[in-house]
């Protein structure tokens, strides 16, 4: 890509798109085209076609997608397949018609079969049945891959498809009903820690009152551990499933780095995985996040809830052969993400505490 090329990042306000935009800006690409959903609805074909005709992007990063965790995929399967099919179809076809030089389509590691051999190599695509919990989303992503390959074969386009592993980082979705496991755990442990702080503060207040009463009655008995404020919190964080599934996690800034690298160095129609090449169990991940957050309570695994795919580790030898490797370790990445999350929580609290001026009410001078 040339530094002054017109580059469109679809989905620039999402986790992946925002990271790609940041990376491009840091690499001195000065002509980015960015549109919010309000400015451009990618599900509306006419709007997308008009946008490509008027803006004439030369390169496209297709990061716009409807994403979510197990609960969201189970609850909204029709939305996941319908919206993703519309977005990718409109963007890919319009990119072809507008003569875009190159397009990068972001897929997902969930495209691989549920019982796929590990690590999952690119050639294992469509070799078995998909994981039922996210099948509609996976099918939509596979359709996007096949569209890129078909357009390359029929029209000679340069559309590449990358398959990232599980992602996390600043700008992630922390909604407990729709988020993925890592951001959900960060929020759960943080809120449990904050709840315990409030409980301890309340207990200290009660203990001080008890001490004053005890002194007034001249009791000589030594204080209990409860009186010294040493009582355990007794709180617990609940996690879906058994904790045994293995997952691989890549910081979104590393993904963005890989995407820009591949846009400049990869030309094959065949998909290419983007990952770290190492995985961790959900229980090990929970222990790591618990330690980083500083939560002192216990962890409970709700075995009545689904685990999802038993293991998801991407084979990354193809990417490594091109000379790319991630730079951010899992601990470092989670620490960075947790700091960002805490800052966002503080910002929201500050905004919620600001006085609101209602209709017909005067602002105090």
Feature-to-residue mapping (PLM):
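Conserved beta-loop-beta element that borders a ligand/cofactor-binding pocket
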Residues: 107-108, 145-170, 183-186, 196, ...
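Flexible, glycine-rich beta-alpha linker
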Residues: 111-113, 136, 160-182, 246
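Conserved Rossmann-fold NAD(P)-dependent oxidoreductase catalytic core, especially the SDR/UDP-sugar
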Residues: 3, 89-134, 160, 173
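NAD(P)H-binding glycine-rich loop region in Rossmannoid oxidoreductase-like domains
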Residues: 45-85, 97
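Adenosine-cofactor binding site in Rossmann-like domains, unifying the SAM/SAH pocket
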Residues: 25-50
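SDR active-site strand-loop-helix element
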Residues: 10, 35, 60-66, 103-108, ...
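Active-site helix of classical SDR
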Residues: 136, 140-143
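C-terminal substrate-binding subdomain of Rossmann-fold SDR/epimerase-dehydratase oxidoreductases
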Residues: 10-11, 19-27, 191-198, 205-219, ...
């Amino acid at each position: 890509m040339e530094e002054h090329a017109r580059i469109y990042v679809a989905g620039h306000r999402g986790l992946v798109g925002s990271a790609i935009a940041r990376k491009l800006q840091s690499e001195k690409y000065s002509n980015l085209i960015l549109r919010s959903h309000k400015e451009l609805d990618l599900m509306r074909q006419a709007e997308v076609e008009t946008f490509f005709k008027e803006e004439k992007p030369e390169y496209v990063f297709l990061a716009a997608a409807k994403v979510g965790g197990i609960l969201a995929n189970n609850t909204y399967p029709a939305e996941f397949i319908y919206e993703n099919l519309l977005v990718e179809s409109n963007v890919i076809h319009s990119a072809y018609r507008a003569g875009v030089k190159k397009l990068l389509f972001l897929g997902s590691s969930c495209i691989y079969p549920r019982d796929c051999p590990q690590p999952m190599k690119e050639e294992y695509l469509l070799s078995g049945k998909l994981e039922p919990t996210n099948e509609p989303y996976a099918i939509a992503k596979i359709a996007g891959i096949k569209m890129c390959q078909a357009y390359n074969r029929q029209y000679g386009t340069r559309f590449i498809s990358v398959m990232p592993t599980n992602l996390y980082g600043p700008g992630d979705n922390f909604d407990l009903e729709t988020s993925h496991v890592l951001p959900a755990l960060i929020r759960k442990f943080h809120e449990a820690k904050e709840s315990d702080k409030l409980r301890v503060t309340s207990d200290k207040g009660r203990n001080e009152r008890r001490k004053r009463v005890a002194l007034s009655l001249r009791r000589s008995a030594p204080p209990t551990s409860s009186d010294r404020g040493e009582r355990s919190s007794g709180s617990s964080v609940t996690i879906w499933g058994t904790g045994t599934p293995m997952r691989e996690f890549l910081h979104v800034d590393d993904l963005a780095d890989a995407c820009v690298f591949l846009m400049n160095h990869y030309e094959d129609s065949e998909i290419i995985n983007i990952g770290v090449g190492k995985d961790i169990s959900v229980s090990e991940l929970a222990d790591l996040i618990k330690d980083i957050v500083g939560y002192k309570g216990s962890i409970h695994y709700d075995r009545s809830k689904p685990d999802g795919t038993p293991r998801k580790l991407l084979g990354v030898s193809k990417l490594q052969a091109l000379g790319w490797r991630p730079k951010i370790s899992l601990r470092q990445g989670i620490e960075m993400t947790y700091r960002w999350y805490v800052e966002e929580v503080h910002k929201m609290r500050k905004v919620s505490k600001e006085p609101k001026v209602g209709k017909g009410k005067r602002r105090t001078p």
